[in-house]
A protein has these predicted regions:
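Alpha-helical transmembrane segments of integral membrane proteins
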Residues: 2, 137-138, 146, 150-170, ...
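Cytoplasmic juxtamembrane interface segments
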Residues: 3, 47, 53-56, 61-64, ...
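Hydrophobic alpha-helical segments of integral membrane proteins
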Residues: 5, 9, 89, 93-119, ...
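Residue-level signal for discrete positions within transmembrane alpha-helices
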Residues: 12, 136, 140, 176-179, ...
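An internal, D/E-rich "acidic patch" concept
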Residues: 67-71, 81-84, 88-156
């Protein structure tokens, strides 16, 4: 077991290096950048994400010069909108954002800093990236935890019921419903919920933005809880929609596999009722794979739904932070959040594998390759 864990931990290093390297290469060719953003702000130009994507220049390569740009000097020719600006000012911006160094040197410096969990400071927020992540992480964590809890709370009883009623009309209709729900993208369902229940076109029952109301700190403790769940209802439903199908069908198939085994027939032959067979014999074995998959289900909820759902509902978590950082070309925040997401994902995947062994000792990781 120890050697397996050691191999998995060592494999995390090249995996993280590969993720950071590919992302760094993509950034080199991405249009726009922090220098262009500052130039656009000075000139009053549109700095929105759409304009930067549809527009030209990045921070990482020379571009063709106009006559005015040639007069301004070679330094300003790299950036769209820099024509006529003092080349020394452009160079000072490059130095401020670290673009005065060649790309390999910047990448090596980033790896060295990340190895010490030093993600630098945000370009435009004047605060360290680590502090930003600490501030935003609880929001994303709470969404992931409650979404996973809600999924297990509904899917496990439903999956057991479907296994008991396998082939019945109940099984057929519920399968159709959860498969349709699985096919609907979470962000599209979130927009539908807003239209129906958040003042879009019909009812105005739930709030549209944030996790708490104004003046939340002044509420009594019981009203704080009510207000929190009032705000989180629509985001949770939107995130959990796709996970319901996966967990329900996993539970159903796990129970069906156990029900067909010899020990179940023996229990029935000994006179045990169906309820005793199901909950005293089948339940413990069938739930092994479901319970062991809890870390994986949580990390899936943490990653897959947080970006779009947090953006749609204006929830101030890591997903929204990453989205805004990409639009603003705030590269320290982009790479810092990417590193944290990747590291957490790798660690939780390892924990998920170890959970299988802890729940089912028959699994022997020492006998298999990583």
């Amino acid at each position: 077991m120890g050697s397996y864990i050691a191999r998995r931990i060592l494999l995390m290093i090249p995996t993280l290096l590969g993720i950071l390297f590919v992302s760094f290469i993509v950034v080199q060719f991405a249009p726009g950048g922090p220098v262009e953003r500052v130039i656009a702000q000075l000139s009053g130009a549109d700095t929105g994400g759409t304009s930067r994507i549809s527009g030209g220049g990045g921070d990482f390569g020379p571009r063709g010069q106009t006559a005015a740009g040639a007069a301004a000097g070679a330094a300003s020719s790299k950036y769209r909108g820099a024509q006529g600006l003092d080349p020394d000012f452009i160079k000072s911006l490059e130095k401020q954002f670290g673009f005065d160094k060649p790309a390999p040197e910047r990448f090596a410096l980033m790896l060295w800093n990340f190895s010490r969990f030093d993600f630098g400071k945000s370009y435009f927020r004047d605060v360290s990236v680590l502090q930003l992540i600490k501030e935003k992480l609880p929001v994303s964590m709470s969404l992931g935890i409650w979404m996973t809890f809600l999924t297990y709370l509904i899917s496990i009883p439903l999956g057991i019921r479907k296994a008991v009623k396998d082939g019945s009309k109940f099984d057929t209709w519920t399968s159709a419903v959860i498969i349709v729900g699985f096919a609907i993208p979470g962000f599209l369902f979130a927009i539908l919920l807003i239209i129906l229940f958040a003042g879009g076109s019909f009812l105005n029952i739930f709030p549209l933005r944030g996790l708490t109301s104004d003046g939340w700190s002044q509420f009594p403790w019981y009203w704080k809880i009510i207000d929190y769940f009032w705000h989180i209802t629509l985001p949770l439903i939107s995130m959990a929609l796709g996970a319901f199908a996966t967990m329900t069908l996993l539970t159903k198939n796990s129970f069906l596999d156990e029900i067909r085994k010899q020990y179940v027939m023996t229990a029935r032959a000994k006179g045990c009722s169906e309820r005793q067979v199901l909950y005293n014999h089948v339940f413990r074995n069938a739930m092994l794979i479901v319970i062991a998959g809890f870390p994986g289900a949580f990390i899936h909820a943490f990653f897959s739904g947080s970006l779009l759902i947090e953006t749609i509902f204006s929830l101030d978590g890591l997903g929204l932070l990453g989205f805004e950082s990409v639009l603003n070309r705030d590269y320290p925040v982009v790479f810092g959040t990417l590193f944290i997401f990747s590291l957490v994902g790798l660690v939780v995947n390892l924990i998920s594998d170890l959970a299988y062994m802890w729940i089912d000792p028959r699994i022997d990781f020492e006998a298999r390759e990583v």
